[in-house]
Amino acid sequence: MNFDFSEDQKMLKEQVSKFLSDNCSLDVARDILESDKTYSEEVWRGLVDLGLTGTAIPEEYGGLGLGALELCVVAEELGRAAAPVPFSSSVYLGTEAIVKYGTDSQKEKWLPKLAVGELISTFALPETNSEPTEKNIKTTFSNGKINGRKIPVADGSCSDIAIVVVKNTDNDHIALTIVDLTSENVKRNQISTLDPSRDHAEIIFENSDAELMDTGDEGWGAIENILNSAAVLMAFEQIGGAEASLNMAKDYALDRYAFGRQIGSYQAIKHKLADMYVKIELARSNSYYGAMMLNDGGDDLKI
């Protein structure tokens, strides 16, 4: 396998890296952790101004019309900066679902607003603490209304619309719907999770208006398709975060002295850093393969 990013994609990576270096230090993430804010509006607005929220949205709907590989390089830099923004929920999941499975009218209605950051979207799948499966989806859709409960929903408190996974009572198939979270009969409760860096919410739908999306006969396969694509992008975020952690550990090992020597000069510390480096590079290789499958539509993506 001979895979690498193009020069244009590397330039995009550098542009995003510079913006985040200048505007998203770790102090920004700490501020979100220690406050009632759900995300950094300043960093989000900067990403919007760069056009990144419309990276993979077709140009006809106001996006940049780029692809999965461009999103991969953006994701790596977001992870490196631990950027406290709803990018994964809104771009990797919500927007991607509409691009793939929205009707023409739904694309015309929602994508331009998502491209310019006027709206934030999320993906509402789980209903319990267990792994979501086709069998445990209890939220129902019937006659343009949905009823049920989703928990936890990442970035559920700050999102404007949600792609909600439901069971269509007309045919008993799993389907996707679009719900305006600001409308009546939608209740949201912010919840605490093991990850305080992300906003999570419980969302309750009580005869809420919903738009049925066009998943054809795919059913649960459509959900797997969206999640598999997002998993590759999240892997790139994790690579960026892991590499940043390694660099921080290396800098500390060179700056910290014990018994008159840099602790980085001790073999045990060198081994720890070397092990971290090897694991990161292995993860990078796997992620690059995932990016290639994502770009080419290969069958190995689901693996």
Across the structure, where does each feature detected by a protein language model lie?
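Glycine-rich beta->alpha junctions and the first turn(s) of the following alpha-helix
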Residues: 3-12, 52, 80, 186-281
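Residue-level signal for inorganic ion chemistry
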Residues: 9, 20, 74, 103, ...
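C-terminal helix-coil-helix/basic helical segment that borders enzyme active sites and/or dimer interfaces
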Residues: 27-38, 250, 254, 258-261, ...
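Internal helix-loop-helix
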Residues: 48-108, 112, 116-117, 154-161, ...
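Structural signature of FAD isoalloxazine-binding scaffolds in flavoprotein oxidoreductases
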Residues: 65-74, 111, 132-136, 179, ...
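A short, Trp-centered hydrophobic/proline-enriched beta-strand micro-motif
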Residues: 117-128
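A short core secondary-structure module
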Residues: 124, 149-186
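A structural signal for short hydrophobic beta-strand segments in well-ordered beta-sheet cores
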Residues: 139-141
